[in-house]
Regions:
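Short beta-strand micro-motifs in enzyme catalytic cores
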Residues: 6-8, 76, 239-241
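Short, well-ordered coil/turn elements that cap or connect secondary structure elements
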Residues: 29-31, 57, 73, 106, ...
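S-adenosylmethionine
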Residues: 104, 138-246
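Short aromatic/hydrophobic contact patches that present stacked aromatics
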Residues: 9-11, 85, 180
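Conserved beta-strand segments of alpha/beta enzyme cores
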Residues: 33-35, 61, 132, 158-160, ...
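Proteins enriched for Cys/Gly/acidic motifs involved in redox and nucleic-acid/cofactor modification
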Residues: 54, 58-92, 98
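Conserved SAM/SAH cofactor-binding pocket of Class I
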Residues: 84, 88-167, 175
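N-terminal auxiliary segments of SAM/dcSAM-dependent transferases
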Residues: 1-72
Length: 246
């Protein structure tokens, strides 16, 4: 799901029950409307090489397999097969979290990555020294690609892929020293109580997927729950932040 100026945009698999989805939106009573367009068949194998390149963020460098040789000199090289999962380092939100987490994650940390997608953030956390990383993903279609990326980067012993709802899983994963959440702002607000409850006393939450225009509203929503802003990055229209318990 992607937040756009006039609402939300998402992708649905072929054969999705569009009428049921439209009825559910109307039944919510929000006054929202819904429209569709056919994306057609996408040949991911030929699309990605033209769109995905090498991205360097501090000590971390991210590249697809066909460009892996170009990041051999990086302190922390990460090779990600794009497939259909979000998180190749191309987007500002991914780069924002990658930048912030380098000053936060310590050797031996327990980390939870909510909405793990391609598992790029989970892999980065492990390579930064985390001893245990729970990569939580609700989209079952993303799991296989994430598992392959975890294996490819040699962090299988520290990163566990978990399919499920972050709100239900966080209490089981607690206490967590660092929580990573690159998801839309409305979901971050929904998860904020569970994140605060699961966080270790000296823990940190690093969030992204938030528009700069949503910054103040998000902070106003989560500060009463016991969060304070420690660091932030704005990249174009996107905002990433490090939050601490207070």
């Amino acid at each position: 799901v992607q937040e756009v100026d006039d609402g939300l945009r998402t992708h649905l698999p072929a054969g999705a029950e569009l009428e049921e989805i439209e009825n559910a939106v109307r039944a919510a009573g929000s006054g929202a409307s819904i429209s569709y367009s056919d994306a057609g068949e996408i040949d991911w194998a030929t699309m990605w090489p033209a769109r995905v390149g090498v991205r360097r963020v501090g000590r971390i460098a991210v590249a697809p397999p066909w460009l892996a040789g170009e990041i051999a000199d990086a302190e922390i090289p990460i090779v990600i097969e794009p497939a259909t999962a979000f998180g190749t380092g191309e987007h500002e939100t991914t780069r924002g979290i990658l930048a912030l987490m380098q000053d936060v994650i310590r050797v031996g940390d327990v980390v939870s990555d909510l909405g793990a997608g391609s598992a790029v953030l989970s892999i980065a956390a492990a390579k930064l020294g985390a001893s245990r990383v729970a990569a939580v993903e609700l989209d079952e279609q993303a799991i296989g690609n994430a598992e392959e990326n975890i294996e490819r980067n040699g962090v299988r012993d520290r990163v566990t892929m978990i399919h499920g709802d972050a709100a239900l899983l966080l209490p089981l994963l607690a206490p967590v020293r660092v929580i990573l959440a690159n998801i839309i702002s409305s979901v971050i607000v929904e998860l904020a109580p569970a994140m605060r409850a699961a966080l270790a006393p000296d823990g940190r939450v690093i969030v992204s997927g938030i528009l700069v225009s949503e910054r103040d509203a998000l902070l106003a929503a989560i500060e009463p729950l016991g969060f304070e802003l420690r660091a932030e990055i704005a990249d174009g229209e996107w905002w990433s932040a490090e939050l601490a318990p207070c």
